[in-house]
């Protein structure tokens, strides 16, 4: 395995004290709300990493900290209700690691409870914070900036299939900042002199989406990061194999499950980083003085078995830059 590349850019200064007790006004252990729109089966790795980040700052669940877990069970419509429950319980901090949806829902309900997010979206563009250097009052976290990731994903696909002229982008209607994602993907394709076709799928339209991809004779496909698509991972990978579509995905869970390639943030780091910031806030630092930080690590994974199954030869240059190659 080639060492993963670390690229963190903290965009601000030191934080000052902000005693939790002054806000919580309640006895006992500090309480952290953990909010994700998926289910434990899909986000359990992020939850474990979140606990690890907290432990690195001295907080251990059950010993000197209580964590209230709220899972949307892959129903994004439940997220505002779950956020409202955490706000009603007056938890000390709300964490939404690895998702923007939970952070946005919590922000709409409270301006006093600190909120920590980690997301692949630009937090300024989607309205989570007003500035990376000086985040909004009670909201801060980590971001990996999907615009850069999408451009890189397309570049990797192009290097794998250099003859490709027409690329596809598989999205859902409910992705946060959908219009921006589509525009960025099309701009990245145009910069390479390629075409980008967008295929939008609903929960019951995954099969139809791949039929559409095949009918459009697309040479390769980018699968966007999205809760619905993550929940349908097995189905999507089966269809990609059936149609022999070269595809790149947003995190290594896809490659581990049989996806051809993945490029994106390390999921566990999204949880760990959120845990680190929550721990710092519990120790007294102010959210708005903790700068939004760039995600520290990304990884590029190639599944050679899948590549061979669809009859593609991986250029040595791609193998050389891969962080991991699954044989």
Language model features: what each stretch is:
Residues 1-327:
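Short hydrophobic alpha-helices and adjacent helix-cap/hinge residues
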């Amino acid at each position: 395995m080639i060492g993963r590349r670390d690229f963190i850019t903290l965009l601000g200064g030191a934080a000052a004290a902000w005693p939790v007790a002054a806000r919580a006004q309640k006895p006992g252990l500090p309480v952290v709300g953990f909010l994700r729109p998926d289910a434990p089966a899909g986000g359990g790795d992020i939850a474990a990493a979140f606990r690890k980040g907290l432990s690195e700052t001295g907080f251990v669940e059950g010993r000197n900290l209580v964590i209230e877990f709220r899972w949307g069970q892959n129903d994004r419509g439940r997220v505002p209700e779950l956020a409202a429950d955490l706000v009603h319980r007056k938890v000390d901090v709300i964490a939404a690691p690895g998702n923007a949806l939970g952070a946005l829902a919590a922000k709409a309900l409270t301006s006093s409870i600190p909120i920590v997010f980690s997301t692949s979206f630009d937090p300024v563009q989607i309205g989570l914070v007003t500035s990376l250097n000086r985040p909004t009052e009670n909201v801060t976290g980590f971001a990996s900036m999907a615009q850069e990731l999408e451009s890189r994903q397309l570049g990797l696909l192009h290097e794998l299939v250099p003859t490709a002229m027409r690329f596809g982008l598989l999205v859902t209607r409910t992705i946060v900042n959908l219009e921006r994602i589509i525009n960025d993907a099309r701009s990245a394709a145009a910069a390479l002199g390629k075409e980008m076709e967008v295929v939008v799928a609903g929960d019951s339209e995954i099969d139809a989406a791949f039929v559409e991809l095949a009918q459009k004779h697309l040479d390769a496909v980018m699968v966007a990061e999205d809760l619905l698509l993550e929940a349908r991972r097995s189905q999507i990978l089966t269809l990609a194999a059936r149609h022999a579509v070269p595809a790149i995905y947003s995190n290594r869970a896809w490659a581990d499950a049989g996806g051809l390639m993945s490029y994106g943030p390390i999921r566990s780091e999204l949880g760990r980083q959120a845990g680190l910031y929550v721990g710092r806030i519990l120790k007294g630092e102010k959210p708005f003085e903790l700068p939004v930080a760039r995600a520290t690590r990304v990884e590029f994974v190639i599944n050679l078995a899948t590549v061979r199954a669809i009859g593609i030869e991986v250029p040595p240059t791609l193998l050389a830059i891969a962080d991991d190659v699954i044989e």
